[in-house]
């Protein structure tokens, strides 16, 4: 048995939460492998919207186990809030959620470092979510971090206090003004730890090995998007983890030969939150229309998302880096009513035409090259069968499949789990 992966192919916000929720019935275990509460995975069913930040998106399904892998960073305060909301919905977390001992903890001072760092950059800020993600991964690679398993060890509180002291010295070096009460922040953090201690901690790499041996079906859930990958994204406007398929191996402790299907999710157009290059960004009425109809606001930050045409150059880059085997297209319904739909097929870059992602998308000479297709006017939100979709919508799908050389197996036409079309 192999582990299947589900990954975003753009700058995040592709709709991974919904699709994980839709596919969970086919699996025994759902596992998050990287990122932290900077993620906002939105699920909608029975007319109610749910947003998850750290907990895997299979949590609402009975008899499904959800695992937070070692590659994830956890903020106990935000985690506590997630737990409380799920308890209100009568979700039995003790039976459905376990955590890797090797996952790192986000301390309150990690958030303060994030804030101080961003303030110190002025106009050159990268658009951090200010959740302390980057500083936590810095402590991880710097071998200073506090891990979930430390909570089971004697003297973890001393390690916590020492790390807080180091962080406070670092914050002072930024020479920016930040208001905070460290004692209140520590008190809130320590009280939130009690909620984590109610759950089971595991040696996740061993757990996954045994689960694979027993033939249990596992779906690994990525966070953010491939274009935010620390190595292969639009650096430095990226997140601090590997959001690509390789991150599932290191973030769960599974070998590459145990990876099965890789499901790549993309929107029918492109969005981005925060700073960073965006070659196909729209500043006109069409971009505003996409944002309004697509409800393009970050589930974590609430910030409006920038919108633009679909970019096949960056999409192919993500497909290649991840080894995608099947495609899933989200929000095709948002494009209804647009007369002409543009698709970026290449870039003019430093006097040449390129069909790959160059070293920097910020180069002033970079200009997208577009092809154009006829749009459709029909409302497709209630369509449940592919054959009943408008001809021009199907032409759009066929065009993308030809260009990307992959089948689009699932099409989402709305936020609810029922608004999903499966293709044979």
Where are these regions (language model features)?
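Non-transmembrane, aqueous-exposed alpha-helical and coiled segments at domain scale
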Residues: 1-424
